[in-house]
Amino acid sequence: DDSSRYSIKIACFPNTKNVVINAFKQAFYEFGMPSSVLSDNGSQFAGFKHGFTMFEKFLMNNDILPIHCRIKHPQTQGKIERFHGSMKRELLNHNLFKNLDYADKALQEWRTKYNCLRPHEALGNKCPADVYTHSERIFADKVEPFEYEPGFKVIKVNSWGYVRFQNFQLYLSETFINDYVQFRPNPNNDSFLVCYRNFVIAEYDSSSGKRIHRKISRL
């Protein structure tokens, strides 16, 4: 949690997309949903070279904004970097674990100490558990139907991850196969925006059809 530094979840499993999403589901069930999630650019989180990831779609399906740190700028995630540093100094550098089960047990014990017993100067010498506030957004693990605002073109993504708009065949991502996206003119310049649910996911040049960026933002 950004404001309180409370460690909501430590998942000690092989780092795959399904494990990551399941870990977030468990965290959301227990602590509620945030308005946004900041992550690094690991392949399970960000799909810059190959469209979009299932993790990004999972967040957007639950009205959570995916945010990625700038590449090669770890200071964007300064708090989590310090968290990792503390974990290494206090636990990982001094222990060899027989397997993931042993590692998980040790990490959960360390997490409890970090949250409940360790004061932080930035928190007025309080512990993260003393200042953390549970989110009121309940996670139901159910994707609610979404109705796009009328007046703009809505197109279904084909089985290769492409959509045809005007005279352009545009690649979005296999992640959105059989999903519907909406095209809107950009009021600020000669381009159009591609929206998934209530998020802008890409911008294309209206003249050339060239993608300008694939940056997710709220509509």
Where on the chain are the PLM-derived regions?
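C-terminal, beta-rich DNA-binding module of retroviral/retroelements integrases
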Residues: 115-219
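RNase H-like DDE/DDD metal-dependent nuclease/strand-transfer catalytic core used by mobile genetic elements
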Residues: 2-102, 106-108, 112, 203-210, ...
